[in-house]
Amino acid sequence: MPRLRYIEESEHTPLTRELIESAKRTGAPDPRVVSLMTRSLLGIAWVEYWNKLLYQGVLPHKLKEMCRIRISVAHQCGYCSTVRSNVAKQEGLTEHMIEDLFDYAGSKHFTAREKAALRYAELFKQGEHAIDKDQVYADLAKHFSDEEIIELGLFCAEVDGVGKFVKSLNVLSWEEACELNPKLNIRAAQVAAE
């Protein structure tokens, strides 16, 4: 049960209605979280920003979706770990690839560029001490432009920070998520062991 209430039909504006409908079409962000966020003017601004960060920019959406899921499982957010972007699916992201996110370095499913982004997402989740190193950025520069690195960093920051907040809203508990996908507990244990 969410800790905040969803927006009521009588509270909708044309914009809040469109943001929720867009979430239903794209699959991410989930309409339930959009319904919570759109009860606040700054929440509406955040949903608009998140949609731009997620679906626009210079990085492929599929790459960002892989990083989002990797970080989400690391902080055991039931909601974030089970949400899937329809756009990323159309771009070729499969559940088999998602399973391989937790052994991305040894996977044949990912390019060197995708592995570099996933490594950065993994380090980002570990904390600022893990990414505040020249070598981290030298490794990224082999695969990404400065513009792409900025976008990747902003994206990981948003996923990590807002993901913690969304987890605390209890839209979907970790236990409920593990019922939907029993492999989540295994993946979370793998991430914790790293």
Model-derived features with residue positions:
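Iron-sulfur (Fe-S) cluster-binding segments and ferredoxin-like electron-carrier domains
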Residues: V83-D100
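Short, thiol/selenol-centered motifs that function as redox-active sites or metal-ligating centers
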Residues: K64-V87, V159
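Mobile cap/lid helix-loop segments that border enzyme active or cofactor-binding sites
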Residues: M1-H61, K89, N181-E194
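Acidic/histidine-rich alpha-helical segments that form the ligand environment
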Residues: R113-L154
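Short acidic alpha-helix initiation/capping motifs at coil-to-helix transition points
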Residues: L41-W46, Q76-C80, Q126-D134
